[in-house]
Amino acid sequence: MNTTINVHLNVTVDDNNSDSVYDVPTLILVLLSILYGTISVLAVLGNSLVIWIIVTSKRMHNVTNYYIANLALADIVIGLFAIPFQFQAALLQRWNLPHFMCAFCPFVQILSVNVSVFTLTAIAIDRHRAILKPLSVRPSKLTAKIVIAGIWLVAMVLATPMAVARRVIMVPEGLIWSPTDIDKLKPFCQAVNLSSRTMLIYSMLLAFLQYLTPLSIIFCVYTRMALKLWGNRAPGNAEDFRDANFM
């Protein structure tokens, strides 16, 4: 069976060998591996516990907790599929994992971040409705489930270009490379199926939809809630002397 290898060479051609771009000290590698591994394990265990509590307790079955469970699920996904693999690739400067994961891991990372941000936005809107219109009809559990499904669908669509773009290619080990050093190539995960201009537009679109738009919505609704609560007085007659005795 013939194997086709894509080699991307953006280096200086020279007959001399060279070291890699940078070498990570073993101690730093071990320390960061422990830290990232701990973060990943805690993220999975902690958020799994949150989901388990919400699922097993009927009184926890409400719209807000559904959103919280969805937020926890997104954190579990990023803890399982993004943190460990993206970390090792960044440190080792090569892709030692199965090639399909080159597209899968960045896709999952963007997917999880999108779900988290959109869910936080949904929670903010739900709290805004509860505080500013407390007597209005509360969204049903079915509505919350539909919103959550929509969040995952939109997040998946926005993450798809990254899966399309990323592929494993062979690149030189060092900055200086000679055509005779064919054995000194390494696998590297890189965006090759989409042009640099397309990736720039995609990054700008993500920044707008993933950061600026949710931030604006959350800022506006929480500002309105703060103003509403700040101007409200507690029920009952205020008595300064009585209230001072409770302080």
Which residue ranges define each predicted feature?
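Extracellular N-terminal segment of 7TM GPCRs
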Residues: 1-45
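Alpha-helical transmembrane segments of integral membrane proteins, especially early/N-terminal helices
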Residues: 1-6, 69-79, 170-181
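Loop architecture of class A 7-transmembrane GPCRs
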Residues: 12-23, 90-114, 130-133, 139, ...
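Extracellular TM2-ECL1-early TM3 structural module of rhodopsin-like
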Residues: 25-37, 60-125, 129-144
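Single-pass alpha-helical transmembrane segments
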Residues: 37-46, 208-218
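Cytoplasm-facing ends of alpha-helical transmembrane segments in multi-pass membrane proteins
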Residues: 44-55, 76, 83, 111-134, ...
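Transmembrane helix-bundle signature of multi-pass membrane transporters/permeases
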Residues: 68-72, 152, 207
